[in-house]
């Protein structure tokens, strides 16, 4: 990744000079570009593995359902980039891969997802130290998290249960990331 870090630094320096950015703005621009590049590679690796295992569509459905809720609900993050890769691959590739081959009762997944809704109602949005949520946005984000969760839940009742299980998996995983056990105690 050193090559990409150097290119990011070069481009951020270019933008700093061109737009007369101070040091803090330079750091913000550089961090933003690092996040974009890092996420691009995580997506590339995750979806490449899903294509290799022939579960691309199921990975996509799971991931999109997850992201629809996460956008407003936020939630815990992996402690390092490598752990994020591992968690993403396990959650969005291998769990769908096994779901295809294991007969899990749809009613069971639906019941777990309804319990997950309780987690969203109680804990969303879940701020982190690195990503605090402004107080003025908390109520709106909670409301939108609940609405999106309910929409995905209702949609899962309408579509074929085989595909719905991946939608439920996505929202269930997101509801788990909201639980306080994943957040360190504040001092």
Curated annotation (Swiss-Prot):
GO molecular function: peptidase activity
Protein name: Accessory gene regulator protein B
InterPro entries: AgrB
Predominant localisation class: membrane
Annotated Gene Ontology cellular component terms: plasma membrane
HAMAP family in UniProt: AgrB
Role noted for this protein: Essential for the production of a quorum sensing system signal molecule, the autoinducing peptide (AIP). This quorum sensing system is responsible for the regulation of the expression of virulence factor genes. Involved in the proteolytic processing of AgrD, the precursor of AIP.
Membrane disposition: Multi-pass membrane protein
Organism, scientific name: Staphylococcus aureus (strain JH9)
One Pfam family, short name: AgrB
